[in-house]
Amino acid sequence: MAPTQAGHDTAYLKETVGEALARGCAAAISAQPNDPVEYLGLWLLKYVKNAEVEGNFYRERQQDLQKKKDRLVKEAQSEQAAKSVALTRKEAADALALVTAEPRELLEAAVKLVKQHTAAGAAYAAVVAEPEEPDWVAPEDDEAAAVETEDEAAGGAALAEGEEPPPEPEPEPEAAPEDGEGDAPAPKIPRPVDYSKKYFAYVAASAGQEHVLEADLYRPAPPPEDADEDFKPEPLPYSFRVLDEKLPMLYVPNVAAEERVKFFRKFPKIGSYQACGVALPASGEFKALLAADTLFPEGSGQPLSADDRDFVWEVSQSLSRALEAVQARAAEALAATSAAEAVEELKAKVAELREQAAAEAAAAAPPPPAEGEEGEGEAPPAEEEPPAEEEAEEEEEEAEEGAEEGAEEGEEGEEAPPKPKKKKKVFNPIPGLQAAIEKLTAAAEAATEADARAQAAVALEKQALDEVVALASSHSDATLSSLRNMLSVPQGTYHVVKALLHLLGRPAASFSTWKRAHSHFSPRLFEDMAAYDATAERDMAVWGRVRSCYKAAPAAKKLDAEMPNTLFGSVALMYIKQVRRVARKAVLQRELAAKLAKAQQDLADKQAALVEAERVKAEREAEEARLAAEAEAAAAAEAEAAARAAAEAEAAAAAEAAAEAAAEAAAAAAEAAAEAGEGEAVAEREAAPAEAEAAPAEGEAAPPAEGEGEAQPAQEGSNSSSSSSDSSSSEESKAAAE
């Protein structure tokens, strides 16, 4: 164990202090100091210090080497990353040039690239737009032009049926080249683009900058004519330098130093601004503007780096190439096909249906009759008051004659019979009601036929409208593609599109400009055209706006030249006018339906009145029969009473006659007595019994008038009795006288 331990210690000493001791001993031997131990100790202390210094040196050197190595690695990585970023940017920019999409989608893609690959706080793009033409305004001094006609032309007065629009002036022939200039025609120099009236319409913006889409950048208004000398005009916005000075790129390191920079929210900020014009390579015409900024607080407020500015420029160039390709494809699509033949067939079919509908409408509602003539479809005259019944008049005349006869008899001293009650005139409404029902039945039948014809006219007009919708829908894809690929506004088509959108009930603010109308170019447009209820009652305020739009449209030839592949402008205008025709026929049909309903209601009322009149007549006849029976019974009783009264009167008359005869006899006797010398007392005694006998005779009842033959014996009996009484009285008077 001991040797092993000793060897281990030796190894330990050799590894730790062996080299230092050996070198120290060698130094002591070489120096031969007086005190070798002290020398060795000092040398070892110095050796330790030197070792520390050397260690620090090598350690620092190693650290420096490591830092340099790290820096080199980082620089290499940064260079590689920069190369990768540059390659990625280049690939992204080059890829944009190959994108096949709509212009707005290309602008949105460019904005996303700028925002993604640069330090810009915001990016946005605008199209170079033309001002839209104003709508048509009705002249104040021409009332006829302000009135809507049946089938008026788009740009002016109405065309008569079968009338063709006036031919457009032929283009002037080009001047022939002068001698010596050669046979080849001189190349046409393109006319420079006039940007003086154009403005920037922003259509794409990065996230958080959506408010930019509601803004448009216009040129300032010209100074007023009565402006003072101190008037300071509004400066032209800085971005218009791209158009006016033909500058492909603008850059402002600090927008606070440039007064011409306009802020969307009217609040000044700090930061940089860059704008690149997007021009078509072939023509050099600026079609759009791509811009980016670092405005604080959305951005850093610092200037854009050179790499960022270069990338924005590269994106604008790629966008130019992509837009040119899109415009070329759109132009090819416009010229590749033509819907002229289909539209002509549609016009012929619609004209035929319109002619049939017009015939049905004319039959349903004929024109008003001339003055003095009687119309067929007029309402029946008012029901006249029915005349009194003839029987009632005859009874009334008989009653009046009887009354007159009674009055004449009363003049002779006899008591006149009582006047019969005057019978009321009874009107019979049944004949008048029957005549009215006959007229109303004829009117209802005529109204039914007119309503059926009006419905047929509406159906024919709707069929024509469906034909127009079918043609428009069959070209919907091509139409939408053409509309969405147009950067410049097609003025004529835009007027018709506005009229169509007004008609379909879209908010007016949503298509006040061509930029805003872009949101309506979707399949829903044609779905709404097919679903529109043309028979509903028209809102004339809306139709006034519709008319102001489509009357501003140009002639058909110019309108068709804007979209020759589908002729959407002409088809949409035909749709609007056909909707108006359907609406007008629907108004006629509703009027005739109302007349039919009224005629049917009047007929039902008259029929009900006839039933009621017949019921009242039956009740009245029953009542009259009852009253007649009662009157007949009363008349019979009255006749019987009259007969009795007549008999009594005759008896009274006979008694009176007898009394008179007795009186005469008494007078004769008195005269005879006077002659014989008898006094007046004897005559009075003879007259008293005669008056006593005549008094009861006056109270006797007279026999009936009809039984005068039967009463004659009684009269004779009374005469005989009176004569016997006279004889007896004379005998008594004689006895008294004796």
From Swiss-Prot:
Purpose: Flagellar radial spokes contribute to the regulation of dynein arm activity and thus the pattern of flagellar bending. They consist of a thin stalk, which is attached to the a subfiber of the outer doublet microtubule, and a bulbous head, which is attached to the stalk and appears to interact with the projections from the central pair of microtubules. Binds calmodulin in a calcium-dependent manner.
Result of knocking out the encoding gene: Absence of radial spokes.
Organism lineage string: Eukaryota, Viridiplantae, Chlorophyta, core chlorophytes, Chlorophyceae
Family: Belongs to the dpy-30 family.
Name of the protein this chain belongs to: Flagellar radial spoke protein 2
Disulphide connectivity of cysteines: none
Further details from the record: In-gel analysis assays show kinase-like activity in vitro. However, such activity has not been confirmed using recombinant protein.
UniProt keyword terms in alphabetical order: Calmodulin-binding, Cell projection, Cilium, Cytoplasm, Cytoskeleton, Flagellum, Methylation
Gene Ontology MF annotations: calmodulin binding
Composition bias type Low complexity, residue spans: 689-730
Superkingdom as given in the UniProt entry: Eukaryota
